[in-house]
């Protein structure tokens, strides 16, 4: 029995290490399949999507993933052109999208929105970003990238730098890393440290240290995960301007890193990684984006097929 069949994907906390490893194996299988065979996995199935916040990579990644396994996609990517402008509730919109699809992807600015949608929908709901809480499919993509590029996850030193307060990818990644034996360094301005309401739960599974100085750690890291400052989540633009550009990864910083270290970023990038880093062997953020297509294809294949694929 495929334990992922019809499963909502709301939080990375809902996945054990064994389940993550099973998803990674399924992703490897997706990559290895002939494209013709791959398109049989979800042939005739439809993925619905509902984006209440802007998205380029995540939405296109899901669409490309579904197309690669033979399925179709439909939905709303510009909420201003939907019936929500007429006052339609999230619950009703979710129900309508569910009628037309076999599974649904939701991005919404409010915390708890994806879990609420899962209660309303009779089809599996996939969280593509829920307020400041989580982004579980990004974390699966990130963990898979680390494993592919470093050949393991256990016993690595991983630095996460940037906006640790508002960046939802950070929380999902930390919970995912809690399944592994890793040394995590959290590097951010004081005002953007990890939220205190999340530290207790994370510390139950993961040891980490906090710092404001990236140069204190950079030469030890196997993985540097860079995040942008989340301008849209600041209540005051003046506060944003105080921390904008706090950390910039450029060639000078790269020279201090291990030769085989890798640099990741969930994207979009603003100014936190210089473009001259892009062509170095350490830059793996575009490969990371490509892996997202395959990890999401694997998740969809597992979610929509009773016996897997």
Swiss-Prot record:
Substrates-to-products reaction catalysed: carbamoyl phosphate + L-aspartate = N-carbamoyl-L-aspartate + phosphate + H(+)
Family from the record: Belongs to the aspartate/ornithine carbamoyltransferase superfamily. ATCase family.
Its job: Catalyzes the condensation of carbamoyl phosphate and aspartate to form carbamoyl aspartate and inorganic phosphate, the committed step in the de novo pyrimidine nucleotide biosynthesis pathway.
This protein's name: Aspartate carbamoyltransferase catalytic subunit
SUPFAM superfamilies: Aspartate/ornithine carbamoyltransferase (SSF53671)
Pathway it works in: Pyrimidine metabolism; UMP biosynthesis via de novo pathway; (S)-dihydroorotate from bicarbonate: step 2/3
Pfam families assigned: OTCace, OTCace_N
InterPro entries in UniProt: Asp/Orn_carbamoyltranf_P-bd, Asp/Orn_carbamoylTrfase, Asp/Orn_carbamoylTrfase_sf, Asp_carbamoyltransf, Asp_carbamoyltransf_Asp/Orn-bd
GO biological process, one term: 'de novo' pyrimidine nucleobase biosynthetic process
Keywords: Pyrimidine biosynthesis, Transferase
Binding-site list for L-aspartate: 86, 168, 228
Subunit field text: Heterooligomer of catalytic and regulatory chains.
Gene Ontology cellular-component annotations: cytoplasm
EC number: 2.1.3.2
Residues annotated to bind carbamoyl phosphate: 57-58, 107, 135, 138, 267-268
């Amino acid at each position: 029995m495929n334990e992922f069949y019809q499963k909502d994907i709301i939080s990375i906390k809902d996945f054990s290490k064994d389940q993550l490893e099973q998803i990674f194996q399924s992703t490897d299988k997706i990559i290895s399949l002939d494209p013709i065979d791959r398109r049989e996995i979800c042939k005739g199935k439809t993925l619905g999507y509902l984006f209440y916040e802007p998205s380029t990579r995540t939405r296109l990644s899901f669409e490309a993933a579904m197309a690669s396994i033979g399925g179709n996609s439909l939905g709303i990517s510009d909420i201003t052109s939907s019936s929500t402008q007429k006052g339609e509730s999230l619950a009703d919109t979710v129900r309508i999208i569910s009628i037309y699809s076999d599974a649904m992807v939701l991005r919404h600015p409010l915390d708890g929105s994806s879990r609420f949608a899962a209660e309303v929908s009779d089809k599996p709901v996939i969280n593509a970003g829920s307020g400041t809480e989580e982004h579980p499919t990004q974390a699966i993509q990130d963990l898979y990238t680390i494993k592919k590029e470093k050949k393991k996850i256990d016993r690595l030193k991983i630095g996460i730098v940037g906006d640790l307060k508002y960046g939802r990818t950070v929380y999902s990644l930390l919970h995912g890393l809690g399944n592994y034996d890793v040394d995590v360094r959290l590097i951010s301005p004081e005002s953007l440290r990890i939220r205190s309401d999340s530290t207790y739960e994370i510390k139950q599974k993961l040891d980490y240290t906090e710092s404001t100085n990236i140069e204190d750690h950079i030469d030890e890291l196997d993985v540097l995960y860079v995040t942008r400052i989340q301008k849209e989540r600041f209540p005051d633009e003046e506060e944003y301007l105080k921390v904008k550009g706090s950390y910039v990864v450029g060639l000078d910083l790269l020279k201090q890193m291990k030769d085989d270290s890798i640099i990741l970023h969930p994207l979009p990038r603003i100014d936190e990684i210089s473009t001259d880093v892009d062509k170095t062997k350490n830059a793996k953020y575009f490969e990371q984006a490509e892996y997202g297509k395959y990890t999401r294809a694997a998740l969809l294949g597992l979610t929509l097929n009773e016996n897997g694929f």
